[in-house]
């Protein structure tokens, strides 16, 4: 088993502009009716090193209902036709956008794409008239650059949870 300290972070305002992508032929594409196989494949590719397990443990129908909810938006980061990352914006709670998942596949770390992806998700999350709070969850198992980036953009911790989980990937 592993223990992790999970934080919920929130921010209430933003005055940033959209960043330029650091790599040519790379785009963020919004997907509608995301196939389960596509999401799970990308989720595993991104989350394996960080013990992302919650979506693997729930029933397929629950994940599909989440992904295809009219208030949940799935975005893929595509480079030269290949998915290399993703993020999900969850607007199911009134006046709140939660960046519920965000990450890059292993071979795409250290290229400036994480900052680009998060800043874009951050700005897209605010890009509606009815949002007054943006949240993101992180934990001690996430990439070491995640928390400092969130704090640099103005996020502040609002809650902490301690979880003890069985390892899924053998980390």
Where are these regions (language model features)?
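Acyl-donor-binding surface of acyltransferase catalytic domains
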Residues: 4-8, 12-27, 32
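A conserved beta-strand-loop-helix scaffold within acyl/acetyltransferase catalytic domains
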Residues: 58, 78-79, 84-96, 101-102
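Short amphipathic alpha-helix that is part of the acyltransferase structural core
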Residues: 21-55
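Conserved acetyl-CoA-binding loop-helix of GNAT-fold acetyltransferases
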Residues: 110-125, 148, 152
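Conserved beta-strand-loop-alpha-helix junction that forms the acyl-donor binding cleft
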Residues: 135-146, 163
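A short helix-loop-beta-strand connector motif used in the catalytic cores of GNAT acetyltransferases and
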Residues: 50-51, 65-76
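Single conserved hydrophobic/aromatic residue that forms the stacking wall/gate
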Residues: 1-7, 11, 162-171
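A short, internal acetyl-CoA/4′-phosphopantetheine-binding micro-motif in the GNAT/acyltransferase core
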Residues: 102-110, 140
């Amino acid at each position: 088993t592993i223990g992790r300290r999970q934080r919920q972070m929130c921010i209430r305002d933003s005055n940033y502009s959209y960043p330029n992508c650091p790599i040519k032929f790379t785009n963020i594409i919004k997907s509608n009716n995301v196939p389960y196989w596509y999401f799970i494949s990308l989720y595993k590719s991104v989350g394996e090193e960080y013990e992302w397990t919650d979506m693997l443990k729930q029933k397929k129908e629950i994940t599909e209902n989440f992904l295809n909810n009219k208030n949940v938006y799935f975005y893929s980061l595509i480079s030269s036709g290949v998915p290399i990352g993703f993020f999900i914006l969850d607007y199911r709670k009134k006046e709140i956008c939660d960046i519920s998942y965000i990450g890059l596949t292993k071979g795409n770390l250290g290229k400036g794409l994480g900052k680009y992806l998060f800043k874009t998700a951050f700005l897209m999350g605010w890009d509606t008239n009815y949002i007054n709070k943006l949240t993101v969850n992180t934990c001690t198992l996430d990439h070491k650059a995640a928390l400092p980036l969130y704090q640099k953009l103005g996020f502040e911790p609002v809650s902490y949870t301690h979880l003890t989980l069985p390892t899924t990937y053998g980390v």
